[in-house]
Regions:
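Transmembrane alpha-helices
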Residues: 66-82, 170-201
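Non-cytoplasmic
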Residues: 117, 126, 131, 135, ...
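Glycine-rich helix-loop "coupling/hinge" segments at transmembrane-helix boundaries
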Residues: 121-122, 150, 198-238
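N-terminal signal-anchor/first transmembrane alpha helix
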Residues: 1-31, 103, 245
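Transmembrane-helix boundary motif in ABC transporter permease subunits
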Residues: 23-26, 71-105, 117
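C-terminal transmembrane helix and the adjacent membrane-cytosol boundary/short C-terminal tail
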Residues: 137, 189, 232-266
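Membrane-cytosol interface at the C-terminal ends of specific transmembrane alpha-helices
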Residues: 76, 125-173, 183-192
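Generic hydrophobic transmembrane alpha-helix motif, especially the helices
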Residues: 47-50, 91-92, 96-153
Length: 266
């Protein structure tokens, strides 16, 4: 069952990655140019319809997959780097455990979304800076998970023997990391899911990288044009569904990998 969930999630992710790659080389229309009638519903020439300015929403949807995936993966990578470094250090070095975990606790109680909005209000983020901000605010969950797993590995007999025999710290830490890597990958996928949702929230509220035309930005422009009020559902549904479907696909992959890791570790 978990393997089926993983395959489904991977298929969803692969689909959107393919769309993003295609959009790098080909788009039906310029996503910001007027290329059709205003407020046009879906048709053969415009499969997702057009905006209030006559922009092709299918082209915007394809193009929007790029920044959405970019922020998701980069923020997850940054979160993983900091989370793994803090988690393994806290587990391996006893003196570092208390201060590092208290630092993680401080970040955990921070209201991430309001803080993102406040930061973005003063500094209009780019896709890169948004990824960095999201990643730096998301690492504590990774750190706590990695610490717990690393402590279990450290207490295993062969690691204790390696420590007592004077094996270099670097070699032991590398071995601990290798054992926690599957869990790191699973939690990185969850972090990517969070990155997608945080970016969508920021974009929808108008404080994200507004020129990137990520899916959340499309929803922001639909809101400002009162698309729902005038019945232009086609301006909202594709991007909104894509955010939800991609986040669900990543979550399925993450849960499958996490359950597989816990099954092996037990």
């Amino acid at each position: 069952m978990h393997d089926s969930f993983f395959k489904l999630g991977f298929g969803i992710l692969a689909f959107f990655i393919i769309i993003a790659l295609i959009s790098v080389f080909y788009l039906p229309y310029n996503p910001v140019a007027t290329t059709g009638p205003l407020w046009s519903p879906p048709s053969l020439s415009h499969p997702f319809g057009t905006t209030a300015d006559g922009q092709d929403l299918f082209s915007q949807w394809m193009y929007g997959s790029q920044p959405t995936l970019f922020v998701a993966f980069l923020s997850a990578f940054i979160s993983a780097v900091f989370g793994v470094a803090v988690g393994i250090s806290a587990a391996y070095f006893r003196r570092a455990d208390e201060p590092l975990m208290r630092l993680a606790d401080v970040f955990l109680i921070l209201p991430v979304l309001p803080l993102l909005i406040v930061i973005a209000t003063f500094v209009r983020p780019t896709n890169f800076s948004a990824s960095v901000i999201i990643g730096l605010l998301s690492w504590p969950w990774m750190a706590r998970t990695v610490r717990s797993s690393a402590l279990s590995v450290k207490q295993s007999p062969y690691i204790e023997v390696a420590i007592m025999s004077g094996t270099p710290h670097r070699s032991i830490i590398k071995d601990i990391f290798n054992h926690t890597l599957p869990l790191v990958i699973a939690n990185s996928i969850f972090s990517a899911t969070g990155g997608i949702l945080f970016l969508a929230y920021m974009d929808y509220l108008g404080v994200g990288p507004i020129t990137s035309y990520a899916w959340g930005t499309t929803l922001f422009f639909a809101q400002t044009a009162n698309a729902l009020y005038v019945g232009a559902w086609w301006w909202i549904v594709p991007s909104g569904l894509s955010i939800g479907i991609l986040a669900t696909g990543l979550s399925l992959m993450g849960y499958s990998l996490e359950n597989a890791y816990r099954g092996i570790s037990q």
